[in-house]
């Protein structure tokens, strides 16, 4: 299939310029600018996609989407409420839990932690926490064995490993709210929970029945944890679930606790896209300078074409293709660089961290301790199209100027 005449002449002009050594500094800078802008935008969007994936896999998969807690603690008639809650449309699973704060001790090392009493069988339906417990510890996690599963950050702080024993001090319940000596319980570290994030440094789990025994709660619990089919509708669903409990309850969802992370990711993605589009735009508009110089350089050729009968539309199309090809080269280079870096972003950052001896994301501050990346080809397509559209826009003025050249004046040497 033959190429359009305008594209063919545009390619000839472009190749001729390169053979003649007329590649201007502005043209090189604009091409490099487009390539860098496209590459950085693809890498940045891939990093944001990675953060969103890890938020879903490491936060939304392990924390309850919603929680219901009785105003009057402990919650004694929770079984009836649980039956009602499980029938609410949109609730995928529900399970009782007990929450309390404890001080865990090993030798001279102390650590304050949030302890959660869970039913091992029901927790597997509620969250993905069991899959983050190292080894097969969850399979042997059961009540009556004085077991505890602690986060890896807690284990490192206490210098303990799976199989060691720790002591945990638990607040002693007193109906008159008098200050009493805390209860001390000796527990066996049954497993280590590794989420590579903030929860590793402050979280532990024990079987629900053991928690009820340690806290003298009988068959009562602190609340009911919920898993929802639509996590972004959590506020409404947890409200619906709270209404069917027939009790005075507090309700909360992951949106109130971790929702800021999702909002921040979306905001940073939008800001990054806007900033990089502006960078690409500045680089593309350097094409204007390049093409204006090219129009002046090729004015004799334009005059000959006009003399041979070329219309204004053909002349415009030639220089639009001329500018578009320059933008296309920079864009394709940027896409190749961006895709390669995005696919290897995590190991690249890990190598840089080892090289400089500094970790960019600390797990005791952020919800993950590595820089994730997930390449979406639709993002690559949008970035490429945006860069080409800006190149096309930048080519229009010089192309229009080329079509207005008077061949008689050029050929007469005026």
From Swiss-Prot:
Keyword Transmembrane: yes
GO terms classed as biological process: lipoprotein localization to outer membrane; lipoprotein transport
Any matching Pfam family: FtsX
GO cellular component term, pick one: ATP-binding cassette (ABC) transporter complex
Transmembrane stretches, start-end: 25-45, 275-295, 317-337, 377-397
Keyword Nucleotidyltransferase: no
Molecular functions (GO terms): lipoprotein releasing activity
UniProt superkingdom: Bacteria
Membrane topology: Multi-pass membrane protein
UniProt xrefs under InterPro entries: ABC3_permease_C (IPR003838), Lipoprotein-release_system (IPR051447), LolCE_TM (IPR011925), LolE_gammaproteobact (IPR011926), MacB_PCD (IPR025857)
Subcellular location: Cell inner membrane
Keywords of the record: Cell inner membrane, Cell membrane, Membrane, Transmembrane, Transmembrane helix, Transport
PANTHER family according to UniProt: LIPOPROTEIN-RELEASING SYSTEM TRANSMEMBRANE PROTEIN LOLE
Family membership noted in the UniProt record: Belongs to the ABC-4 integral membrane protein family. LolC/E subfamily.
NCBIfam families on file: lolCE, lolE_release, PRK11146.1
Record function comment: Part of an ATP-dependent transport system LolCDE responsible for the release of lipoproteins targeted to the outer membrane from the inner membrane. Such a release is dependent of the sorting-signal (absence of an Asp at position 2 of the mature lipoprotein) and of LolA.
Protein name: Lipoprotein-releasing system transmembrane protein LolE
Organism in which the protein naturally occurs: Escherichia coli (strain K12)
Gene name, Swiss-Prot/TrEMBL: lolE
